[in-house]
Every structure is written in structure tokens, then in C-alpha cells.
């Protein structure tokens, strides 16, 4: 669809609870995915929701601690984003545009380039931590949040 925003639904009932549209930007044409807001992710602490905007070359940041989430800021990226993921420690966001964003300051701190300074872009970004030459932790390309609800012991 052409929604520049997202919807929140109740998985049990199938009912839509909230429809959140990006404010201050117009929907526009996109080159891929057919939808201006294809990529969406939660920060690992789940306090924020980050939404890709392929029509305006932006990532919009929403406060996810309130319902419906409230738009707080927008970050300009160098090309049309189609995905976003986060570092395991939650300090950096990786846009499919190759921009690495400091989550706290909202500033681009690095851009991925090849040896000839060409832009490197991918929706498939995986963070792997090594210790003594062996992988000990791995992220994934999905910004699903990392908060785990405590369950009662039986």
C-alpha cells in the first residue's frame, strides 16, 4: 500500500488498534518494495520504533513507550532506505543505505564504502562478535527488540 507510517494490531483478535502516519513529509514514489515505509524496527530496549521512508530518504524515530507511538525526529540518510537493524548493544542502527547511525545522538557516524569509495548498501546486515577467533554472539537483520518478558517459575 502507500501508507507512510504503520499500523498496530492485536494479534489475538486481528483488530487494528492504531494507525500512525508520518508527520511533516509527503508520500512519494519509491524505486523498490512498492511501499514508502517498507522497513520498520524496534530498538533492542523496545523504547523506540524506527521507520524507513523510501520516498523521502529518511528514517523516522517514534517513542514506543506511549500508545500510539509518537514521532520524535527524522534522520536524513544518503539513499532510499528499505531496512534497518540495530547493534546487539543498541548503540548503533544500520540502515540498508550503508549509513551507521549513533542511536543516542541520531547522527551518522560512518558510511559503508568499498575500496574504491563506492557506496555499499544491503538489507542483509549481520553483526557477529568474536572472542579468541570464535563467534560468541550474533545479531540479525531484523529489528525485533530484545526485551524478554519474565515468566513465572512453575
Tell where the protein language model's regions lie, with residue ranges.
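Predominantly soluble domains enriched in secretory-pathway, periplasmic, or organellar proteins
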Residues: 1-154
